[in-house]
């Protein structure tokens, strides 16, 4: 018996909810599946990751003050079919890779883009094992 069954969602706090949701939708293709206000007054948006059950929960709690991304929180990673094709998609949106593409010793290729609020996104093109 496993202790947990699966990862359900990851929560990120942001200053500009609509700008962040637009980025994840337009750039990465995530779908907004739920939006509501919590009893404590924060606004919540759940985004579905394509091809999986995992979600990203984006929250904005204005009374909490400006968001400061912790230096140790480095990135979210998403798999893509082709870094070259994804770079063309990004170019159409006026976005460039902030780092990479780079190839690991196992042949996996990866690159990074900057997301709103100081978060970073890793894009991985797998080759064989990760």
Regions found by a protein language model. Name each.
Residues 51-55, 63-65, 83-85:
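Short, charged/polar surface micro-motifs in flexible loops or helix N-caps
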Residues 1-3, 35-36, 46, 87-130:
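Vicinal oxygen chelate
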Residues 23, 84-89:
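Short amphipathic alpha-helices within nucleic acid-binding modules
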Residues 11-53:
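Core segments of cupin and vicinal oxygen chelate
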Residues 1-19, 73-76, 127-130:
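N-terminal beta-strand motif that seeds the catalytic metal site of vicinal oxygen chelate
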Residues 16-17, 80-84:
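Helix N-cap motif at beta-to-alpha junctions
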């Amino acid at each position: 018996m496993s202790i947990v069954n699966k990862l359900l969602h990851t929560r990120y706090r942001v200053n500009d909810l609509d700008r962040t949701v637009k980025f994840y939708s337009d750039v990465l293709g995530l779908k907004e599946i739920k939006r509501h206000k919590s009893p404590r007054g924060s606004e919540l948006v759940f985004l579905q990751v394509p091809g999986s059950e995992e979600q990203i929960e984006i929250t904005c709690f204005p009374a909490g003050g400006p968001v400061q991304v912790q230096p140790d929180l480095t990135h979210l990673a998403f798999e893509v079919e082709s870094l070259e094709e994804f770079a063309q998609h990004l170019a159409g949106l006026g976005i460039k890779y902030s780092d990479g593409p780079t190839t690991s010793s196992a042949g996996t290729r990866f690159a990074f883009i900057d997301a709103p609020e100081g978060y970073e996104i890793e894009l991985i093109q797998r080759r064989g094992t990760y």
